[in-house]
Amino acid sequence: MAKTQKELDFLRDLYIGADWTRRFTDLIDKHFDLSESENVLYINAGTGEHAFALRERLDEKVGIFATCEDDDILHIARDKAAAMRSDVDFSMIRFEDEAFDSVIVDASFTPPSRYEELVEEAVRVATTGANIGVLSVTSGSFGEIFSLLWEVLFNEELGEHGHAAEEMITELPTLTMIKDTARRVGLENVQTYVANEVFEYDDGAAFVSSPLVADFLLPVWLVTLDEEDQQRVTDKLSQLIDSEDGNLSFRFSVKATLLTGEKG
């Protein structure tokens, strides 16, 4: 049975931050300069782990504001802030134009179709010359999964005989595409940084039952199928992984990507 949004937000706090988000935020820590910032906005901050880490690292005079994706995530983030006595300001408000000299956007868990919308929002709230960093997944990710999903969908005569898997592949933007998007909405001096992150599971069952895959990735990829067909595909995918990899672990890779630029 599909989980409620509140249940998903709880799982996201427990598992996704460590298993997924940290692999992306490492790019911010390595390549995004916040040393001269006076105020920072973190868009899609999740339950706040990286925002708290930035608070510890930056001068106490730097104001850190963070927006959350929904009310339940906001509640978790605020509870954490209270427990840690952190002054990171979590909210879901719409900030004024040109209010921040640094903006971070975590689009790593956002549908690719919303990428431009999030970059536009970052540009709107940034002052002229502000540094903007956007985290996302780019083309070449999940290839090991998509090829197996295509085979399962084709064999089971689902998803228009594998067409759904082909759409999963083509939906992910290339580096050129996200650079073009950034320049189109007003960023200059655009650069990208990519880390090839590998996720490993003992076998097919461990893969399809992991919270990242079972509760977040597969439901999005198989959204066009009814619940019964989704379960059938999941079971067949697990079996196919084991038949192909034998006693070896199953791995898939993700192109964790940071795009940086300055508002012109």
Tell me what each language-model feature is:
Residues 11-29:
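Conserved SAM-binding loop and adjacent beta-strand
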Residues 39-95, 117:
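Class I SAM-dependent methyltransferase SAM/SAH-binding core
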Residues 60, 126-132:
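Short glycine-dipeptide loop
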Residues 101-116, 136-138:
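A short SAM/SAH-binding and catalytic strip from SAM-dependent methyltransferases
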Residues 116, 131-202:
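Conserved catalytic/acceptor-binding region of the Class I
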Residues 186, 208-214, 254-264:
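Core SAM-dependent methyltransferase catalytic element
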Residues 191-246:
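C-terminal helical/coil "lid" or tail adjacent to the Rossmann-like core of SAM-dependent
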